[in-house]
């Protein structure tokens, strides 16, 4: 099964963050989304990403024109790699049950 993040959400997120990759996780990635479900994106950034790009507010700004429930969570590559080994973290869920929906060429 391949899940797809809506272009109306993914395109502005990629333009705003210029990430290494974007991982769809949660119910949409598992194929269990309902009409009331949100879209969860973990946005993996370079380790030298400016701190202002790593905030919850940056995630909101990136998805500002997408008018459906969505969580856009930015994370540095090194943080993702470290936390992806810790069960119960968002990084772990994204690494083990998520689907890469964008990867920088």
Regions found by a protein language model. Name each.
Residues 40-43:
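Short beta-strand->loop micro-motif that forms the acidic, two-metal-ion catalytic signature
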Residues 1-21, 30-35, 45-105:
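Catalytic core of pol beta-like nucleotidyltransferases
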């Amino acid at each position: 099964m391949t899940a797809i993040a809506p272009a109306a959400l993914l395109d502005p997120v990629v333009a705003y963050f210029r990430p290494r990759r974007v991982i769809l996780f949660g119910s949409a990635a598992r194929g269990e989304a309902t009409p009331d479900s949100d879209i969860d994106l973990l946005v993996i950034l370079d380790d030298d990403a400016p701190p202002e790009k790593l905030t919850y507010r940056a995630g909101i700004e990136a998805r500002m024109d997408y008018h459906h429930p969505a969580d856009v969570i930015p994370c540095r590559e090194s943080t993702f790699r470290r936390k992806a080994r810790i069960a119960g973290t968002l990084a772990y869920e994204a690494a083990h049950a998520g689907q890469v929906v964008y990867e920088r060429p």
